[in-house]
Amino acid sequence: PKGVLKAVCDAHRIMLDLAPDRLPFINQFPYHGNIAQLYGFINWPEYLDRFVEAANATQLSYDCYCQMMEGPYENPLYFQNLEYMRDAALRHRIPFWNIVLATPHFRYRAPSKDDMRWQIYTSLAYGCGGILYFTWYTPLTCNYRDAPIDAHGERSERWYMLRDLHRDFRARFERVYLGLRSQHVYH
C-alpha cells in the first residue's frame, strides 16, 4: 500500500503540473479499525498528513456511509471520520469535501430527505467545504437503484429532492456559510 500511495500522489502532482486550471482530487477511504496500519502508518491522522504533503493536495475528499445501513444502526465511525478530515484540513489550511450517500446499493438504504439533510448538515457542521454525491447516476451493475439520474438518463424523484435541499440551504445560509471557518464541534 505505501507504493500505491506514492504512485497516487505522484499522479496527483503530475495532474496539478500539467493542468493547473483543473482541480484533481483523490477520494480517501474512510477510517475504520486498523486501516492506517494496513497502509503502513501509526494512525489515520498521520496517514492524512503524509498524503496531503506527498500529493501537494489542495483539498481532502472522502466518503463514509456507515450510518446509512438498513435498519437501526449507529456507528461512531461516521463522526470520527468527519473529525479526522476536519482536523487534517485545518492543520493544512485546505478544505475538505464529503461524498455523501445518495444512491442505495448493497446494504445501504435509500436515503430519505431527512437522511440527505442529516448527511449534508453534519458535514457542514464539521466545516466541510464541499458536498458531492455517490452516485449521481444509476450504475447498471450490482444492485444500485434510485439514483438522482436513473438508468435511462432521466431525472428521478431523488434528483428533485436534492434540488430542493440545495435551494433551501442556499436561501438560508449561502451568504454566511462561505465566510465561516470551523473552530469547534460539539455534540
Q: Language-model features: where?
A:
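Glycan-processing catalytic domains of CAZymes
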Residues: 1-187
